[in-house]
């Protein structure tokens, strides 16, 4: 099974990269977790933010192959408990398609990305810093896998 986090933003601090890689490497070989970074467009005082979001969305969608699943991470998505995420992870595994978890930039996701989503997931009603979201997703995917495999990490 292949999971990809497609996230707007690059050049994260070292602690973010280390946190992400720590959880990604804990997963078994048959569950790969990859990170695809989309460069954040420069936002100036007079920037056309709608155009920038649209461009970022196009760049995100260009990384998705036909038939792959898109799951957006957004504040208005559905909150999942760890057990619910484990159930989704198991469904995705049985479906055998690549799953693309999409995280937008500071202003969120392009409408075109949201329109392609098969599922919408909310990590929290709180506004979370994007660097932390990467680590949180990695940890939660790892935790969901431990639930499915009976590993004691989740207890």
From Swiss-Prot:
Catalytic reactions on record: pseudouridine(1915) in 23S rRNA + S-adenosyl-L-methionine = N(3)-methylpseudouridine(1915) in 23S rRNA + S-adenosyl-L-homocysteine + H(+)
Amino acids binding S-adenosyl-L-methionine: 73, 104, 123-128
GO cellular component: cytoplasm
A Pfam family that the UniProt record links to this protein: SPOUT_MTase
Keywords, comma-separated and alphabetical: Cytoplasm, Methyltransferase, rRNA processing, S-adenosyl-L-methionine, Transferase
Stretches of the chain forming a coiled coil according to its record: none
MF term (GO), any: rRNA (pseudouridine-N3-)-methyltransferase activity
Top-level enzyme category: transferase
InterPro entries the record matches: Alpha/beta_knot_MTases (IPR029028), RlmH-like (IPR003742), tRNA_m1G_MTases_N (IPR029026)
Gene3D superfamilies listed in its UniProt record: 3.40.1280.10
EC code: 2.1.1.177
PANTHER family registered for this protein in UniProt: METHYLTRANSFERASE, RIBOSOMAL RNA LARGE SUBUNIT METHYLTRANSFERASE H
Protein family according to the UniProt entry: Belongs to the RNA methyltransferase RlmH family.
Subunit structure: Homodimer.
Free-text function comment from the UniProt entry: Specifically methylates the pseudouridine at position 1915 (m3Psi1915) in 23S rRNA.
Name of the protein in its database record: Ribosomal RNA large subunit methyltransferase H
Species this protein is from: Pseudomonas putida (strain W619)
